[in-house]
Structures are given as C-alpha cells and as structure tokens.
C-alpha cells in the first residue's frame, strides 16, 4: 500500500467540516489517497487514534481519512463529496477517537448532509446546528 497526503481532499474536507460539522477539529484530521489496496468494495476509510494510544502517547484524538485512489478517483464530483461527507460523519461529536456506526452514517443521512452542504455553498453560509437541533426536538 502506498499513502499520499492529499492537499485537494484536505481542502474539501476542511470546507465541508467548517460548514456542516462544527464539532470536527479539522486541524486533527488529515486526508490521504491510498493506492494498491486489494479490497473489492471499499472506497474510503476513517481511521482514528484510539483512547489507549492517545493516553500512552499523551496526545488528543486524531483522525485520518483514507480514500482509495483506484476507486475514488473515478467517481463524479458529487459522489466524491458524498464519500467525504460519509467519512466525516463517522467522527462523533465528542471528537474523542471513537466512531459513529453505519446505523447513523447511512445513505439517507449522507444525502441529507450533502443537501445541507450544497445549500450552504450556494448561499455562502454555515449551518446553525444549535438552531436545527432545537427545531428537531420541538417536532
């Protein structure tokens, strides 16, 4: 396997996180393209520095997003955005080194976040998550 830091994916992930995932400490997330994987169905992976290693190394949580170049690079721009959103969605609000599972990170929720992101880009805004939570809790 070959791993390369990807400045272009990093910029996209930073923009997405800044607009729709304010809990993500984007300076503690790095994006990589990988080449040479033998996996058949995986397009991307979210890796985390787990609690034990954080404690052993005396460092805070850190995430690495891996995009398998052979598959990811062939996708349309919109599909790439959805994959990046999907991987960012795995990062929990506590940003402690854990993961949200696929009960939460699913196609329906990815599509919703993608729509939110595209609306933010169109309107040059960020999402007010606190307002949205209050609104959801009232309904």
Located regions from the model:
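Metalloprotease/metallohydrolase-associated module, dominated by Zn2+-dependent proteases
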Residues: 1-78, 94-139
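Active-site recognition of the HExxH zinc-binding catalytic motif
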Residues: 82-94
């Amino acid at each position: 396997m070959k791993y390369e830091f990807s400045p272009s994916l990093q910029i996209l992930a930073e923009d997405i996180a800044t607009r729709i995932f304010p809990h993500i400490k984007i300076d503690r997330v790095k994006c990589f393209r990988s080449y040479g994987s033998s996996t058949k169905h995986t397009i991307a992976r979210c890796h985390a520095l787990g609690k034990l290693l954080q404690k052993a190394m005396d460092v805070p949580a850190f995430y690495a997003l891996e995009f398998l170049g052979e598959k990811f690079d062939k996708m349309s721009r919109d599909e790439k955005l959805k994959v990046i959103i999907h991987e960012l969605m795995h990062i929990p609000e506590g940003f402690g080194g854990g993961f949200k599972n696929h009960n939460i990170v699913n196609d329906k929720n990815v599509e919703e976040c993608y729509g939110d992101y595209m609306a933010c880009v169109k309107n040059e805004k960020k999402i007010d998550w606190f307002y949205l939570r209050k609104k959801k809790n009232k309904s």
